[in-house]
């Protein structure tokens, strides 16, 4: 069974508590449960990883070489700053879809730049947790 890695960056572990007007009341555990259910239906394996530390995210990407089909990533605030994550994604050559719960282009101007987008086959922003589900369906369609 092919595996999809779902990576979440800083503060995503605080969903349900942090800025509910922006991110809603759903928790990371609920997102993972929804993705696990869909993955079972689609007959694909998902692995979840969240870190507040850029280097740990890079390590996880590098450790995934030859172990995964693709990556769904919400790099959170690292979207706008991390050339390191961009380079890690570039180095493993698997399909990547960037996901954001909020519409980063409707927020503060500094959030409008994504260093990750250039390494992704697509970006989903502003569709809440449905963005993760759409990304998983798309990733499976590429298999």
UniProtKB/Swiss-Prot annotation:
SUPFAM superfamilies on file: Type II 3-dehydroquinate dehydratase
An annotated GO BP: quinate catabolic process
Residues that bind substrate: 74, 80, 87, 101-102, 111
Pathway of action: Metabolic intermediate biosynthesis; chorismate biosynthesis; chorismate from D-erythrose 4-phosphate and phosphoenolpyruvate: step 3/7
Protein name from the UniProt record: 3-dehydroquinate dehydratase
Pfam families: DHquinase_II
High-level lineage: Bacteria, Pseudomonadati, Elusimicrobiota, Endomicrobiia, Endomicrobiales
Keyword field: Amino-acid biosynthesis, Aromatic amino acid biosynthesis, Lyase
Record's signal peptide: none
Organism: Endomicrobium trichonymphae
Entry's transmembrane regions: none
Active site per database record: 23, 100
Domain of life, per lineage: Bacteria
CDD domains according to UniProt: DHQase_II
The protein's role, per its UniProt record: Catalyzes a trans-dehydration via an enolate intermediate.
Catalysis performed (reactions): 3-dehydroquinate = 3-dehydroshikimate + H2O
